[in-house]
Structures are given as structure tokens and as C-alpha cells.
Amino acid sequence: MATFTVNGKSVTVEKNQKLIRFLRDELHLTSVKDGCSEGACGTCHVLIDGKPTKACIPQTDKLEGKTILTVEGLSDWEKQVYTFAFGEAGAVQCGFCIPGMVISAKGLLDVNPDPTREEAAFAIRNNICRCTGYVKIIDGILLAAKIFRAGKLPAPSADDWQMGSRVHRLDVEEKVLGYGQYPDDIYVDGMCYGGAVRSQYARARVLSIDTSEAEALPGVICVATQKDIPGKVNVGHLKKDQPTLIGVGELVHYLGDSVALVCAVDQETVEAAKKLVKVEYEVLPAVHNPTEAAAPGAPLVFDEEESNVQAYKHVSRGNAEGAIKNAKYVLTEHFSTPWTEHAFLEPECCVALPLDNGGVKLLTTDQSAHTTMHECASMLGVDYDHCQVQNCLVGGGFGGKEDMSVQHHAALLCYLTKRPVKFKLSRQESILVHPKRHSMDMDFTMGCDENGIIQGVKASVVSDTGAFASLGGPVLERACTHAAGPYAYENFEIEGRAYYTNNPPAGAFRGFGVTQTCFCTETLLNQMADLVGISPWEIRYRNAIRPGGVLPNGQIVDDSTGLVETLEAIKPAYDEAVKNGDPVGIACAMKNAGVGVGIPDWGRCKLIVEGDGKVHIYSGASCIGQGLGTVLVQVVVTNTGLHRDDIVYERSNTWIAPDSGDTSGSRQTLVTGEATRRACEKLKAELDAGKSLADLKGTEFYGEYLAKTDPLGADVPNPVSHVAYGYATQMCILDRDTGRIKKMVAAHDVGKAVNPLSVEGQIEGGVVMSMGYALTEKYPIDENCKPTAKYGMLGLFRANQIPPEIQAIVVEKPGLNVAGGAIGIGEITSIPTAPAIADAYYRLTGEREFSLPLKNTPYAPKK
């Protein structure tokens, strides 16, 4: 027992427990976010006697007489300042890390009211952010310090909410102050908890499952196995190959496979009961990598498949082999890129509530409420009106929350027990379960003429897609179609194969396969520049695709193509670095916006004038931190002339909001933005006719947009693989003395920047994420196909490790005739970073590396 003070009130704790559990579960102070429970991420920071401390570390019995402060306990003035400063700086994206950042900032500013930028970065070194790249969080802390010193709030720099305005995001306050709800922040009467009994082996056959001891444990409500599933057993994003539960006689495919589910009155009982479920296995040889998977006589990951090949892609145009044979210069290299963990700050969580009609309502953190509805309804064997899904705040995704993780398990337990169920993955489960970035091995050959003009590229790609299909096929396709780079040449051929293994599944990750093949193409182009005797900038400028040019996939690009403009934007900084003798690396990239390649790609939006006299925006598109809600409000303001206060953004749900597809593929700003614009046209017509919002109460205005494209290989004069591409040039400058990065420059063509503040944040965040990909991040898997790293050992960059300067250059190239010309930027920001960094280190050391993460840098782990 211990007595201490929390936010000015004395509390007595009878049961010894981690402080985070007491604050969240008993006091419901949900600004204290649970990101890892391992002392690694910093989302649970509180002040203990004025010192920032991770609440997941101390036990309550050790806190006698201490004074504890959470964000809820800040003064009203402090809350106003941090909300304004973080909003003005653009410091908030998914928001899950932000209350912890605020606490660390207060710990600094209470003792140092005028810190330097370096001191602010050091103060949040124990707080990880995966979205922002820290730049704007540090800006927010310094602005807060300035406001505290001045004693009054300034006016916001922009508040007109037109497209192009640097407005504060609409969700800033709830995220800064921690009262916005992620699923784990939800507590309801009678709520019980769920957990999964997972396989002990990567490949084995289940011989028996005995749940009797677990069922007899006091506090256990139910233990479910495959026989309890009322509908279809398998789920899966595209291919239904992932069993909700593995049944007796069936193969487990990786260590994350579930064989039973436990539902109990609290999480402690869940964990105890899981240990009492007895599973007998026939252990079988596992498939560890694509080489083993492709070997003659290899074990099959799936009984029902004829081979371990999950996907095959062949993309060809012209005569690559002939062009390379006749080229002046030819280079061939083998490249290898690693598995990468998304490491979003919010672990997967779902709260399932029973509906009066016998169905379930799911409160989720995922990238598509409608996809979750489709898969869970199929598993339960119910109609869609018996499976409702509501997005809560989403604490980051980056592709890692496209697949089922906990939603189907929460739905099943709720459906069986008729009780509210919270189902959350531990951080280690999250690291094991959700799909990762594919590791790839790639062989590339490039030929150029004497002027450095690309004549042809030929390549092969092999990816490890792990235990399930997930999005392995589309990722492989995108890796292949974009491997040619954003350049104008005709001869291109690439073969790609994705293999099933018994590793954790791989799927969507920011960049969607392009991050891997871009590393190859851009590295070869840098080598080729040296052979030809021109600069890496010049070789790109000569080859860059321009309006009216033809990409290697056959698509004639339009006037919105802005690659040259991004090259020109970084040219002054590039020339200065070369003049100063700084080691400098450069790389370009392109990335599609939208699904493309002939697949129907719908954006949908419904504007409803509700009883409050305001326009409510409903779309099935998930806002996962990228700022979609703010974008849609700006679209409505711009296209209707209404005031911001007349508009309400509603989070995605499945019973009112129309399906607008997954938040992936950099698509939502374009496709849902255009659908929203079309809905606005109808509303504007009524307003122009003299009607007021009061007159329009109860009226709905629907907009939809189909991004029409052609399938790969379509026999048409101008095959349109994608409705739009984003283009980028990034540059890395090293400090020759320390060998560390002193500046990153990233110029990105976004068409129209709906909110330049958010665009800059996306650029900075993508750059820092891929700095980790290039230099430090790792996802080691042992001989048992088990990932071995904890969250704190993944190699994620921290605030005091980023370069002194990350310059985001927003290039606006008009020409796109939808969504006001806006192109999504979520993915491309992370694509050219690694090859730019790799070339900078070659310029420093004279040694070129073809595998990631780079080994010969000051960032590499000490041997």
C-alpha cells in the first residue's frame, strides 16, 4: 500500500502494481498512453517530483509521498500554451506520443525557460515519435517556451481554412491534452479482456487442444477454439489465407498463429489462463527464407498450395537485353534490403460491444473500417448491419494496420459472450503479428550511352512475404513497375517472385515495395554518373521524365509532372555542398497516388446538414495521423464558401460513411478529396440558390470519384497505370569530420499542398523514418523464425540523433484536374532517402555498399 499525490489529489493504492496501470485502469487518466510497457517508447511519461519518468517502470509501492503530474493536471494556461504551440508548429500527426512529449517539455521548461534547440531535442530523447521526425515537435517546444516567457498567446499564423493555408489541424487539442480516445482509452461497464494462445512453433501440425484447465480458472468467461467460429474461418486482405484460429489437424504457419482465444474479467486472468491451454503439436521443418522456399522438395508453408511461390510478376517494354548489350556503359549489382518493423506508437487494440440485434460494434484502430467490417462479418457469418465498425483515433499505421490483427478476435469473443471485450496486443505480440516491410534480394543491370542517357534496365526481385499473402502480390507488383525509376527510356524488363516462408508475414509498409527497388536504381545511377564523368545531379536531369514524356511502363505523363522542378529546387544546396567539399548524395523517386493498374479505385463522401445546422463530413476513409480530416474540412471550406465553424468532420464508420477504400497507396487526399469536392458542388448549388444551412437540415449531398486506370500490359496507345504520380529529389550532406549527417534536403512535388504545414511534417517524418531504414533499423529473426528485438532495440531514430537540419521543400506543380490538383505524399517521402544517404557515404569513404542498413557509418552498432 502507498499514498501519494496525483494531479493535486491524495490517493491511496492498496494493490502494488505498475504506476501506468493504476493511472489508466483505476483513475482513467488516459493521457498516459501505453505504447510498450517496456520502458522504451516514452508515451507514458509523467512527472514524479518534477522529473519526467516513464509510468510503466515504477511500482506503486515505491511511490510513497511522491507527487505525480499527468497532462490532465496541467494548469489551464499550460494547456492553452501547449495546444497552441504544437498546433502552430505542426507538431501533431497521429498524436499517440504527444502527451508524453508535453510532459517531457514541461520537465525541461520548468527548469530551463529558454532552451536551445539541442536542449529541447535532448529533453525528449526518451520519447519516440514515428510520424513527425521530431522537427516540428522541437519547434513546438521552443514556441511554447517563447509564449510562456511572453505571458500571452499570439494569433495563429493562418485560420482561413482555405486549401493552401497552414491551419492548425482540427484534432490538435484532443491529442495534445490526451483526452482524444484511441481504443485502449475506452472503458465501459462490464468490460472483459481477450488474449490469444499463439503457436509455440513456426511450422507444426496441431494434434490436440485442451482448454479444460483454462476454462476452470476463476474469472475466465470463455475459451474459444476454431469450432466456435460461426462463419468462415479464414480472413485476409486480398487472399483469405489467414485462419482466425488454427484447428486440430491443421498447420500453423508462423509463431503468431492463434490456436485459442481467452476471455476473462481482467488482463491478469487472461495471461494466466493462456498458460493453462494445452496444445500438442507435431513439429515440422520450417521454411526460413526464399532460397529454402524455392528449393526442390521444400516443405510447403500451406498444405493446399502446390509451391511456395506466393506471387509472380513480369513487367517488360521494349528490348532491355538488346539495349544493354549495345550500351556504352553497363553495370550489374546485387542488392539486399532488410525486414523492417513499422513501430507505430500505438499497439493494435479493439473494443467490441454487443449490439441489441445480436451483432457486434467494433471500435478500432485500423486503416479501413469497411475492410474490417467485411472480414469480421464473414467470420461471424452475419450481415453487415450486425457488424458495425467505428474508427477511433489511430496511433499511426504506415501500412501495418491494413490487415486483421485483433479486430476479428475481439469480434468473436464479444459475439460468443455478449459482453464488451477489449483485445489489445502487447508490444512483443505486435512486433510478431502484424505484417512487416518485405526483405528483398535484387539483381539489377543498367546500361547507359556515352552521355549518361539510360538505354535499358533488366532486373530480378525476390521477396520474402512470410506466412500469409497479405499484400505481398501488390507490393511485388509496385516494386517491379516502379523499378525503372522516374526516367524517360523505353527498354525495361523485370521479373519478381514473392515466396511464402514461416517468418512473420510481410505486407504494406510506407513505400509499398518501391523503397526497396529505388535503392537499386538510384545507386546504379550514381555509379553510372561516375563512369560517364558527370555529376549525379546532372545524370538525373538528363534522364528525368518531363511532361509529354513516356515512362518505361508506357504511360505518357501529363503537365503535372514535376520531377525536374524537384531537381532544380535542390540544385543550389547541391552546388554549395559540392563547392564546400562536403560528401553529398542524391536520389530521385516517383510514387503512384491511388491503387491504379486497372483496379477500381473509388473515393466516396457524404455531406449531411444535421440538426445542429452544420455540415457533417462522412467518409469511410481512415484518418491515421496523416491529417485527412483537416484536408477534407479545407476542401469543403474552399469549395462551398462556408466558415470552418459550420463544418464537422466525423471519423470513419460503416453505417453512415460510404466506403472510400483503405488509407493506403497515398490515395485518400486525391480520391476522397475529389469525391468531397464533388459533394461540395451539389451543396454549393443549393447555397447559391439562396438556401441557408437551416433550410437544408436533413439533406445529404453525395460525391464519388472513380480513378480510372488501365491494367498492366493493356494494349492501348497511352496506358494509364496510375491517375497521378508524386515526384521527389532528396539529398544527404555529411559532416566530413564526424561522418554524421549534417543536413537532409527533400524536395517533393505535391501538385497542390492542401496544408503546407502538414506536408512539411510528412516530408520530415518520412525522411527520418528512412534514415533509420538506411542506417540503424533492424528486425532480426532467429533460426526458429522468431523476431528477437524488443521495441527499444529496433534501431529507431530519437530526437537527439536527427541531423541539425532537415529542409523540406514543397514543390507545387499545377496540372492535375482532380482534388484541386493535390497529390498524396504519405509514401514517397521515405523512398529516395536511403540511396541518397548511401551515396553520400560512398563520397566520404570510397566504399559503396549494396545492402541495408549500411555498415560503415558512425550510426552502425559498435562491434
Identify what each model region corresponds to.
Residues 397-418, 422-424, 628, 634-635:
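Thiamine diphosphate
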Residues 46, 174, 180, 250, ...:
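Short beta-strand elements
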Residues 145-310, 330, 416:
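Flexible, low-hydrophobicity surface segments
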Residues 1-156, 597:
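Signature of N-terminal electron-transfer/Fe-S-associated modules in redox systems
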